[in-house]
């Protein structure tokens, strides 16, 4: 099926959001996903089906240290 992920067209055989996250090699605890302009809670990913033409925005969380101001 054809999906749009972060504005880029991609083909995928994943049938659910959970399978897509696994297929893309993402760490589930480090991303948030919006499917067709709706944020999908992480616990719903395994049973959230994907359909041809779906649009996803995937945000990666990156940890960092704190810097002291000069």
What is each of the regions a protein language model found here?
Residues 1-70:
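Ubiquitin-like/PB1-type beta-grasp interaction modules and other compact soluble beta-rich domains
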């Amino acid at each position: 099926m054809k999906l749009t992920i972060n504005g880029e067209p991609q083909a995928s055989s994943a049938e659910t959001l959970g399978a897509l996250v696994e297929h893309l090699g993402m760490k589930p605890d480090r991303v948030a996903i919006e499917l067709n302009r709706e944020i999908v809670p992480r616990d719903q990913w395994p049973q959230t089906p994907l359909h041809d033409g779906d649009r996803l925005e995937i945000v990666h969380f990156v940890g960092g240290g704190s810097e002291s101001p000069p």
